[in-house]
């Protein structure tokens, strides 16, 4: 279903069964009660997982610059009864308007240049999404706003992380997606 839980549903089942540690647990170390800002909401896959991990005492705000995607994600999340708050806006503008250290974690998952085999609905998402890459000035604002860490997700093949001076966390050679952790306020990647 467009805008539906998709791969997040599988990730949530794995978390519930205790079988696998999700990247948001392993790399982001999300914990109950934390405040998360998903700066590139898309279909809200990561926001759904983050909401489960931070629980009812935490909060997740999803920012989406594409109006159609924001509407689809919001409708789907409301149908599910999710506590994720959706806001249609430019994430850079939102971040600039927030006080320093006002959220625990900022998450970026910019649009991948091409589909990964495991991503159903990617072509529709790409047609609706903002294709702009993550900019260094927006990353710097995220570091200012995050109390603990900024997470950046990217396709393994893309030079985006390297272009931002980031290194990805250890991942299996076959993993199509990699994550980088950036210490809040430091401007430096967290050493693996």
Where are these regions (language model features)?
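Residues at the starts of beta-strands that form the adenosine-phosphate
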Residues: 35, 58-59, 83, 148-149
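A generic alpha-to-beta junction signature in SAM-dependent methyltransferases
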Residues: 54, 99, 144-146
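S-adenosyl-L-methionine
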Residues: 1-35, 39, 44, 63-105, 172, ...
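Conserved SAM-binding loop of SAM-dependent methyltransferases across substrates and taxa
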Residues: 43-57
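Conserved Class I SAM-dependent methyltransferase catalytic core
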Residues: 135-183
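Mobile active-site "lid"/loop adjacent to the S-adenosyl-L-methionine
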Residues: 106, 110-138
